[in-house]
Amino acid sequence: MAEKKQWHETLHDQFGQYFAVDNVLYHEKTDHQDLIIFENAAFGRVMALDGVVQTTERDEFIYHEMMTHVPLLAHGHAKHVLIIGGGDGAMLREVTRHKNVESITMVEIDAGVVSFCRQYLPNHNAGSYDDPRFQLVIDDGVNFVNQTSQTFDVIISDCTDPIGPGESLFTSAFYEGCKRCLNPGGIFVAQNGVCFLQQEEAIDSHRKLSHYFSDVGFYQAAIPTYYGGIMTFAWATDNDALRHLSTEIIQARFLASGLKCRYYNPAIHTAAFALPQYLQDALASQPS
């Protein structure tokens, strides 16, 4: 029997992970990035950009539930949601489950990502692209948040790592633009890497976001696809109370929402804001 091909992630030079490739479904270099989708017996369909795993069918629900339900339920009455990135449609899928949300705008820099994900990752979007509340904008995220006349209650930055096209979504210009189009009391969240291996990313984001928001922090989730431990999500708002809501308040909102989740629950919500001491120490040691 012929040995299966292997796909090796190239995010780190000295260590990493690989996937056995059962079948390559799509591989093309677009105007912005090198994109591949392949099948793996353990993780289902896997999508990678520029040599870095972005999502798998096996565990994507953890990432997307935590990126959406934490800010939306903490906010409590979000009507207008902005997603930066998220071309695979899974973030959109989770936001559409909130029936009180009136409009969902998604800004994706690469139209090719949206088109092939509709074809090759149908379980991710699960028909959410057809939701009447949804509007797709093909634009650079930094440009959009600094130019739009729209305002939002929750902004979700479903960004790649801060290399290549995703680098601009970790800049002060982007964070300032998000503050500009965020309604009073609104919440900004963003993917911020695996803090044990990418601690400098969290420190840099915390420093930059603190220039624009009065309450900046992080919450976490364990997502097997992202090599190295716990995935960290940046959190920023001017409503200092939202990060510290009791489990009882979140529980009441969760029950009222009718959500049925596979990872997220109210206890996970409040526990996710507890950070390991090494990260707390690193953040505390930074100059104000």
Swiss-Prot record:
S-methyl-5'-thioadenosine binds at Q33, E108, D140, G141, P165. It is an enzyme of class 2 (transferase). The keyword Transferase applies. It is found in: Cytoplasm. Pathway: Amine and polyamine biosynthesis; spermidine biosynthesis; spermidine from putrescine: step 1/1. InterPro entries: PABS, PABS_CS, SAM-dependent_MTases_sf, Spermi_synthase, Spermidine_synt_N, Spermidine_synt_N_sf. It catalyses: S-adenosyl 3-(methylsulfanyl)propylamine + putrescine = S-methyl-5'-thioadenosine + spermidine + H(+). One of its GO terms (molecular function) is spermidine synthase activity. GO terms for biological process: spermidine biosynthetic process. Homodimer or homotetramer. Belongs to the spermidine/spermine synthase family. Catalyzes the irreversible transfer of a propylamine group from the amino donor S-adenosylmethioninamine (decarboxy-AdoMet) to putrescine (1,4-diaminobutane) to yield spermidine. This is Polyamine aminopropyltransferase.
